Amino acid sequence: MGAPLAAALGALHYLALFLQLGGATRPAGHAPWDNHVSGHALFTETPHDMTARTGEDVEMACSFRGSGSPSYSLEIQWWYLRSHRDWTDKQTWASNQLKASQQEDSGKDATKISVVKVVGSNISHKLRLSRVKPTDEGTYECRVIDFSDGGRGVPRVLCLLIPLPAPPRAPRPRGQPPGEEPGRGPTLLFLIILPGTGSGTPREAEPHQPHAGGCPARQS
């Protein structure tokens, strides 16, 4: 009875954290975000919440339709932010994240892990993360640069990865081969989406070593 109760309490703890983060990032009295960013621009595909066990492969999809006509260049950037602790600080998000400057507001703990650029009005890019592990914990961000507006606005979707601790190891049943061990605990991907503005310098980036998620978004 002790192990199942501990696992249930752990799951409730992370569910409470997810609800707290969702409440902190949505102003009171405001309707949920929609997919539209500005004009006809919108996200046509965003990452979904998902669960995965340690060692599994996961992927997060991000698709965007630009507002430019005729076609202009679009760019998708995937970023990895090593820490998610500031997510619980509502004032931090309101003052820092939603008022991004014209420069890349990457921060010292952010790493650009993937870049795709196309000439056209639609772009799509899936971030594939192999053999997820607890050290993959952090925030994954999909930024879109729409050059039809001069690259002034950068709509974004943010995905928070929270690995759950592994459950207590159960005794090996009689007759089970010594090499077999119980599986690791699940990894939860919670999705939180915020609007934002900013700009990025297009360039290729080396993939991030940790291998890592629909909610709507709009640009303020």
Swiss-Prot record:
Signal peptide: 1-24
Disulfide bonds: 62-142
UniProt keyword Repeat, yes or no: no
Name of this protein: V-set and transmembrane domain-containing protein 2-like protein
A biological process from GO: negative regulation of neuron apoptotic process
PANTHER family for the chain: V-SET AND TRANSMEMBRANE DOMAIN-CONTAINING PROTEIN, V-SET AND TRANSMEMBRANE DOMAIN-CONTAINING PROTEIN 2-LIKE PROTEIN
Amino acid composition bias (Pro residues), ranges on this chain: 165-180
SUPFAM superfamilies assigned: Immunoglobulin (SSF48726)
Region (Disordered): 165-220
Keywords from the UniProt entry: Disulfide bond, Immunoglobulin domain, Signal
Tagged with keyword Transmembrane: no
A GO cellular-component term linked to this record: extracellular region
Domain Ig-like stretches: 41-158
